[in-house]
Design a protein with these regions (language model features):
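Basic/aromatic DNA-contact patch characteristic of tyrosine site-specific recombinases
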Residues: 13-14
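Asp/Glu-centered strand-loop micro-motifs enriched in Gly/Pro and often flanked by an aromatic residue
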Residues: 35-49
Length: 256
């Protein structure tokens, strides 16, 4: 039987306090025509049959930040991030998804330790890690997080962030065509026909590069798509009904 996927990411509610990563903050000279940050990341993970896409997207961003700081290629504890995020959103004891704002806040409040300290075991999806693990997590706290505005400028903002070396975690509305055999085989995502296709729900992924399209890391294992990755058109990211939310994390201030 085909693997069952969960689509229960929640859209961020409006919060005027969000620090925005707009055009001015991400001003660049001549950005490269293409960027590919996959070599700084471990093999694509598989979230399994729980709705932990938000934690997988956040862990990819954390892994890249650690690599940038000279820490090598690591796997952050996806389970720890999934649990702390849901704990703070009041949904630890159910699998009802989470928001990306809650994810970045948990990354800043608790940190995300290496997966060697708290492996990805979904039987522990509804319990907090022991205090010793949470104490170690504090060494890996995100110091900054910024929201990328959705809308027509989003594809360019994604590219500017990626050109500056920041992976972008994002939440999107997905439709039937995303689960098609064609996408699973080749990793090329079409624009959905929202008038005729069924809405699957919300899903978090991470943009890790671009050329003509944006290169996206999923969390359905390396057998799906292009080694676990897919390519999505700019039009998807420019549509605020499809792209819900987008964030970057950093260990330092971005811009001035």
């Amino acid at each position: 039987m085909p693997e069952s996927h969960v689509f229960n990411l929640k859209r961020d509610p409006v919060d005027r306090r969000d620090l925005m990563l707009g055009i001015g903050r991400m001003a660049v000279g001549t950005r490269p025509k293409s960027v590919d940050l996959r070599s700084a990341l471990p093999a694509v993970w598989n979230q399994g049959d729980v709705g932990s896409c938000f934690a997988h997207a956040g862990a990819a961003c954390q892994a890249h930040q650690v690599f940038k700081e000279g820490g090598g290629i690591i796997t952050p504890s996806r389970l720890c991030l999934a649990v702390t995020t849901r704990h703070d959103e009041g949904t630890l004891h159910c699998d009802n998804g989470a928001t990306l704002r809650g994810t970045v806040k948990a990354m800043a409040r608790y940190g995300v330790p290496p997966e060697t300290l708290w492996p990805y075991d979904v039987s522990k999806y509804f319990e907090l890690p022991p205090p010793a693990v949470l104490a170690q997590a504090e060494k890996w706290q995100a110091l900054r997080y910024y929201r990328i505005p959705v809308g027509r400028h989003a594809p360019e903002l994604f590219r500017r962030a990626l050109a500056a070396g920041f992976i972008v975690m994002f939440g999107a509305a997905l439709y039937d065509s995303f689960e098609s055999e064609e996408v699973a085989a080749a990793g090329r995502v079409p624009m959905p026909n929202t008038a005729t296709e069924a809405l699957l729900g919300g899903h978090a992924m991470a943009a890790v590069g671009y050329d003509a399209d944006l290169l996206v890391r999923n969390s359905w294992g390396p057998e799906w798509g292009e080694g676990g990755y897919c390519r999505m058109p700019d039009a998807y990211f420019a549509d605020p009904d499809l792209l819900w939310d987008a964030w970057v994390i950093s260990l330092t201030e971005i811009g001035k």
